[in-house]
């Protein structure tokens, strides 16, 4: 039969940044870019807007969804998360690819963040695609090489809705 595989539907949340948030993302992203260059860290991949600006925009969108202020600190921070909600630490990953992949470096540990959330960016509009708990994501069987070296990788269709991840 030509039956399509079942892909769980997740509720996607779209957030369009306002003028102030766009300026915050741009200024903060430029600051992070300079800091990363100073530290010898470079972002991989080619994108239309600087990955640091896109990443900051994704963090702002997720923070707004949870009615929190984003952490816009610039500089090397040792902690492995971007946001904390109800004692759950969250690492926000932003992509310009659609469908997107949630990816994290193989140096990540479950203790770095409790949850990973994938956001699609079409600046200034960001769509929260879903998330996954670190213990489920950071498993050897999720390590794949998509052309940039081995990373923990999940397809967008493997993610869970935020609502299901935050069920009490």
Residues of each region from the PLM?
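Nucleic-acid endonuclease domains
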Residues: 1-86, 93-168
């Amino acid at each position: 039969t030509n039956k399509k595989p079942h892909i769980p539907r997740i509720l996607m949340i779209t957030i369009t940044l306002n003028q102030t948030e766009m300026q915050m993302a741009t200024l903060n992203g430029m600051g992070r870019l300079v800091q990363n260059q100073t530290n010898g860290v470079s972002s991989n991949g080619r994108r239309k807007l600087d990955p640091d600006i896109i990443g900051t925009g994704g963090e702002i969108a997720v923070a707004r969804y949870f009615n929190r202020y984003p952490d816009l600190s610039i500089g090397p921070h040792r902690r492995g998360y971007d946001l904390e909600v109800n004692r759950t630490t969250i690492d926000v990953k932003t992509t310009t690819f659609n469908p997107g992949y949630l990816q994290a470096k193989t140096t990540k540990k479950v203790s770095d963040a409790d949850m990973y959330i994938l956001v699609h960016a079409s600046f200034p509009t960001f769509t929260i695609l879903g998330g996954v708990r670190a213990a489920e994501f950071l498993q050897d069987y999720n390590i794949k090489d998509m052309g940039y070296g081995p990373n923990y990788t999940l397809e967008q269709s493997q993610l869970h809705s935020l609502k299901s991840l935050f069920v009490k």
